[in-house]
Regions:
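Mixed-charge, Lys/Arg-enriched low-complexity segments
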Residues: 1-22, 58-114
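Amphipathic, interaction-prone secondary-structure segments
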Residues: 19-59
Length: 114
């Protein structure tokens, strides 16, 4: 099981196509920083032939921590992708809601002079 091979398949995560994977001090563990959020992926210390994926938000809270057996298996790999994509979608949706709320607020406070 090759950690880097699995990680390389996760590369197109950001909108601009860039990813900043870096190694951590733990053996066979890598992290991806997306804004203030960090995704860790590495070999599981609890399960044989498995990966641990942990998503940490900007203030250090663990958003999700999952163990996936043999991500080379297409079903497990798609679950791994879905987990990360769902997290990114939730973050994106949150920001879109904030933007929408601000626009609504501006519309209500704007006086139109005819």
């Amino acid at each position: 099981m090759e950690t880097k091979a699995t990680i390389s398949r996760l590369i197109p995560l950001t909108n601009d196509g860039r990813c900043d994977w870096s190694e951590t001090s733990q053996k066979n563990q890598y992290k991806l920083t997306l804004g203030t959020n960090v995704i860790y992926i590495g070999k599981s210390t609890k399960l044989l032939n498995a990966y641990a994926v942990e998503i940490v938000d900007g203030i250090g809270n663990v958003v999700t921590k999952e163990h996936y057996r043999t991500p080379e298996d297409s079903i497990e790999t798609s679950i791994l992708y879905s987990s990360i994509e769902a997290f990114l979608d939730r973050k994106y949706r949150k920001h879109m809601q904030e933007i929408s709320d601000k626009l609504t607020e501006l519309e209500k406070s704007t006086v139109v002079i005819a």
